[in-house]
Design a protein with these regions (language model features):
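Structural motif
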Residues: 23-26, 126-128
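Helical "substrate-binding/catalytic lid" subdomain
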Residues: 1, 11, 32-161
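Phosphate/pyrophosphate-binding betaalpha-module
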Residues: 7-18, 25-28
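A conserved hydrophobic position in a structured secondary element of the catalytic/binding core
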Residues: 4
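ATP-dependent carboxylate/acyl-activation modules
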Residues: 17-18, 156, 160-166
Length: 166
């Protein structure tokens, strides 16, 4: 994902060709375009990771079935429309720690997801999956959500709904 003039790209292409996998590089356009394409790529990655996470959580939460998530990941990564390198990584992680008990459900964002969402806003392009994946990362970092306390309080106040207390 290179952003460069055609002349500059012609000079650096032999080096990039040596380092990149076959057909794994290209000139995206003028200077800056490579960063832009990589930013959107990473935003898409946020959405894909979130979808995998949600899917595996649904599978794990099933009361009806005792599912082997590692086995499912292995099957999906070899013969499924959702196969990907990210799924390869999920299979590897689930093989060594099937419940992922060594991890906290905490995910930082490195900036590219935010930049992608800002670009979507600036250009008026709906990007609900990428936006929600970014917001899910924000939520993962909260010990206690004041917003959800307000929601619980309002539900209690207007409808007498049950709430959990400290």
């Amino acid at each position: 994902m290179v952003g460069a003039s055609e002349e500059a790209f012609a000079i650096i292409e032999p080096v990039i060709q040596t380092l990149a996998p076959e057909n794994g590089y290209g000139r995206m356009g003028p200077p800056g375009s490579g960063h832009f394409v990589k930013m959107v790529h990473n935003g898409i990655e946020y959405g894909m990771m979130q979808a995998y996470g949600e899917g595996f959580e649904i599978l794990r939460s099933s009361a009806e079935f005792d599912l082997d998530l590692h086995q499912i990941a292995e099957v999906w990564r070899r013969g499924s429309v959702v196969r990907s390198w990210l799924l390869d990584l999920a299979a590897h992680a689930l093989e060594g720690d099937p419940d992922l008990s060594s991890l906290r459900g905490y995910a930082e964002d490195s900036g590219e997801g935010r930049w992608t969402v800002v670009e979507a806003i600036n250009t008026g392009v709906p990007a609900p999956v990428i936006t929600e994946a970014l917001f899910a990362r924000f939520a993962s970092r909260q010990e206690e959500s004041f917003a959800m306390k307000v929601v619980a309080a309002l539900r209690r106040e207007f409808g007498g709904h049950a709430v959990k207390t400290e």
